[in-house]
């Protein structure tokens, strides 16, 4: 009788490890698929080194990121003159920021989306980037697909 309980206990532990392994594998594949979308999105906004070198650095006001020097928004800048190449670079920089600072600046899908919403104002405001090549709805939809959903 005691042997049966030991065998059952071993089977239960083995099954628990298998289930944990399946969950971890599924979670890992979800994360990988979200991060692989960066390659697809890179074609949405052309990369330009011009904007990255010319822009000021500010610190975003996000939960866990207040006064955190590891979280710059390097795409803020004086007006681009609505230059298409500079505006595309601003969009690419947002995508780069999401991936470069995942877990440092935002660690939930919700605050990543909040970042995406705030960045449109920077992209579009005449006194900042001054770009209007992408409307706000398209901007949010594009960046929502970049935010890792974990």
Curated annotation (Swiss-Prot):
Its main location: secreted. Keywords: Pheromone, Secreted, Signal. It comes from the Eukaryota. It is found in: Secreted. Pfam families: Euplotes_phero (PF05842). Coiled coil: none annotated. The keyword Oxidoreductase does not apply. Residues 1-16 form the signal peptide. Residues 17-52 form a propeptide. GO terms for molecular function: pheromone activity. One of its GO terms (cellular component) is extracellular region. Mating ciliate pheromones (or gamones) are diffusible extracellular communication signals that distinguish different intraspecific classes of cells commonly referred to as 'mating types'. They prepare the latter for conjugation by changing their cell surface properties. This is Mating pheromone 1. The lineage of its organism: Eukaryota, Sar, Alveolata, Ciliophora, Intramacronucleata.
